[in-house]
Swiss-Prot record:
It catalyses: an acyl phosphate + H2O = a carboxylate + phosphate + H(+). Belongs to the acylphosphatase family. The lineage of its organism: Bacteria, Pseudomonadati, Pseudomonadota, Betaproteobacteria, Burkholderiales. The keyword Coiled coil does not apply. Its EC number is 3.6.1.7. PANTHER family: ACYLPHOSPHATASE. The keyword Hydrolase applies. This is Acylphosphatase. One of its GO terms (molecular function) is acylphosphatase activity. It comes from Cupriavidus metallidurans (strain ATCC 43123 / DSM 2839 / NBRC 102507 / CH34). Residues 7-93 form the Acylphosphatase-like domain. InterPro entries: Acylphosphatase, Acylphosphatase-like_dom, Acylphosphatase-like_dom_sf, Acylphosphatase_CS. The active site is at R22, N40. Transmembrane segments: none annotated.
């Protein structure tokens, strides 16, 4: 059985900056075997671009809705993105 790789762009809204969200998100994505990146946005959101099997992307989305203990996530937006392959999961500078 072949696993199809998808790429999703996700935005976490709420109290998601200054609470360890990016580090915890990168750890979770890495533990799920996903590639991609996470970064803070100047508007207060956290943006994620992640590639991997749909079920692992869905697991990341579910985690993002709760986040680390200090986070207060109000919503997570998800959109399909152009397929991309990544070797690892990185942090990018704020954009």
């Amino acid at each position: 059985m072949t696993t199809t790789t998808e790429t999703w762009q996700l935005f976490a809204h709420g109290r998601v900056q200054g609470v360890g969200y990016r580090a915890a998100c990168a750890d979770r994505a890495t533990s799920l075997g996903l590639g991609g990146w996470v970064r803070n946005r100047v508007d207060g959101r956290v943006e994620v671009l992640a590639s991997g099997p749909r079920e692992r992307l869905e697991a990341l989305r579910v985690w993002m809705e709760a986040g680390p203990p200090a986070a207060q996530v109000s919503k997570v937006e998800v959109a399909q993105a152009a397929p991309q392959l990544f070797d690892r999961f990185d942090w990018l500078p704020t954009a």
